[in-house]
A protein has these predicted regions:
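General N-terminal leader/first-domain-start detector
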Residues: 2-5, 22-23
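Extended amphipathic alpha-helical interaction segments
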Residues: 97-183, 189, 201, 210-220
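Immediate post-signal-peptide N-terminus of mature secreted/exported proteins
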Residues: 22-98
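Contiguous, function-dense segments enriched for cysteine-driven chemistry
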Residues: 26, 103, 198
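Sec-dependent signal peptide recognition
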Residues: 4-13
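C-terminal motif of bacterial Sec signal peptides marking the signal peptidase cleavage site
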Residues: 15-19
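Extracytoplasmic/luminal low-complexity segments enriched in Pro/Gly and acidic/polar residues
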Residues: 187-251
Length: 251
């Protein structure tokens, strides 16, 4: 089960800027891009529960399959086809998720040239915090790319598994080798996911620090979007560890 921490949206309730005649001040422009990036990750956020649900359904089918004997091959084949269909649905949602992350990163990147417009003396702290934010976001994005690639590899192995299960002459050793590959692959997914979560948590804290270093009056939402949703998913993972395929005892 993929567990992602999410951006925490912040609300700008009042801005008092002296440079309004020359357009929005740099810190206000940065704020707008940062919060637009949050909005662009909404699609990413919306994929989380459906992905978990698809994984749960697939695990149920897999459990049914391994409890059947080869005398019930027609049922095994039917369940395998259903599971393969669920894998395809997961693929679609993961791709949507990535598109959302990519769009948010593209929006975020717009702040880099604006950081140079922050005053070296009067806004030195804000400038330093903004630069830290860029570094963390880049690390977070790189971590997501690794997570996406790891998950893609795991999905391909899942597809291969359900193709194998539709072969009546499938040998137990071949099946077990495939299951081992899948479990190893999902271990990498979990590791990459933990790194992504760490960078997201770090980013959310640093964004708050950046806002506090400016003249922006920002209200911080009480809804702990990133932490609470991730913690909820962590519990779901414990209750439904889809990332691990059980060994088979089919005969």
């Amino acid at each position: 089960v993929l567990l992602r921490k999410l951006f925490i949206p912040l609300s700008l309730i009042l801005v008092m800027l002296a440079a309004c005649n020359n357009g929005p001040a740099p810190e206000e422009q940065i704020y707008e891009h940062l919060e637009e990036a949050v909005s662009l990750e909404e699609e990413f956020r919306e994929q989380q529960e459906p992905i978990v649900e698809l994984e749960r359904k697939e695990q149920e089918l897999y459990n049914k399959i391994i409890n059947l004997s080869m005398d019930e091959f027609d049922q095994i084949k039917e369940y395998s086809q259903e599971a393969a269909s669920l894998v395809e649905e997961r693929q679609e949602k993961i791709d949507r998720e990535k598109e959302s992350i990519d769009a948010a990163k593209e929006e975020f990147d717009k702040i880099e040239p604006i950081i140079d417009d922050l005053d070296e003396e009067e806004q030195a702290e804000a400038k330093e915090e903004a630069q830290k934010l860029v570094e963390t976001m880049n690390n977070r994005y790189d971590a997501y790319q690794q997570l996406y690639e790891s998950y893609q590899s795991a999905i391909e192995l899942d597809k291969e598994l359900y193709e194998l299960l539709q072969q009546e002459d499938l040998e137990e050793e071949t099946l077990q080798n495939q299951i081992d590959k899948i479990n190893d692959s999902y271990d990498k997914v979990i590791e990459a996911n933990e790194e992504f979560n760490q960078y997201t948590e770090q980013y959310n804290k640093q964004k708050k620090t950046f806002y506090e270093s400016t003249d922006l009056n920002v209200e911080y939402s009480e809804q702990e979007n990133g932490a609470s949703e991730s913690e909820s998913n962590e519990q779901e993972k414990e209750d439904n560890p889809d990332s691990e395929k059980d060994d088979t005892d089919q005969e």
